[in-house]
Design a protein with these regions (language model features):
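Cytosolic nucleotide-utilizing catalytic cores of signal-transduction proteins
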Residues: 1-188
């Protein structure tokens, strides 16, 4: 592989260091390379692999770092700093070569909520996302979104009219959660 647009850095890591400590170190290095306020330099993304213990692990670590860069850009834009272990489900989604398939899945699953042409759709997607993230805990969702409990109950009823009974159908909830994650990916 050519490195015309890549810089590969190997950093010694304490095997007992937490992933957070490693990411702080890498973020500090990226900040220095980027310069204050970017300094007019091109933006760049940084991918971090899992630690390796021998030179034999370099090819796999390189592949992990590249995957972290690729998926990190889709999720966070051109200046992403992403650890391979933080990719989660996005690691699998990135394996789907046809973005059109992902877009169709989002459109079919979210219906009119898939469009970005309305602030109301964005608001309802956010409500749905927090509901799913809190495992349909209405009180916690209302607290996180600063809604009155009854306002949230109204929104849930509206969402269920649009999407189906996601509060009682775990399979539908999984489909919607996946569609929301795909919707967040750039270029989809």
């Amino acid at each position: 592989a050519g490195f015309s647009q890549e810089v590969v850095a190997l950093l010694p890591a304490d095997p007992t260091a937490s992933a957070d400590a490693v990411m702080r170190t890498v973020a500090d290095i990226a900040k220095v390379v980027r310069g204050d306020g970017g300094g007019g330099r091109r933006s760049f993304s940084t991918g971090v692999s899992r630690p390796i213990t021998s030179v034999g692990g370099l090819p796999a670590a390189y592949a992990e770092a590249r995957k972290a860069v690729h998926v990190g850009r889709q999720m966070h834009g051109e200046s992403a700093l992403t650890h391979f272990d933080a990719l989660g489900i996005y690691r699998l989604l990135a394996l789907i070569p046809d973005g059109g398939d992902l877009r169709r899945f989002v459109d079919e699953s979210l219906g009119e909520l898939a469009t970005d042409d309305s602030p109301e759709n964005e608001d309802l997607r956010r409500t749905l996302s927090v509901l799913i993230d809190t495992n349909i805990n209405v009180a916690e969702t209302a607290r996180q979104l600063f809604f009155h409990y009854n306002t949230l109950r109204y929104r849930i009823a509206k969402l269920e009219r649009m999407l189906g009974p996601f509060t009682t159908d775990a399979q539908l909830r999984l489909t919607l959660a996946l569609a929301l994650r795909i919707h967040q990916m750039r270029g989809i």
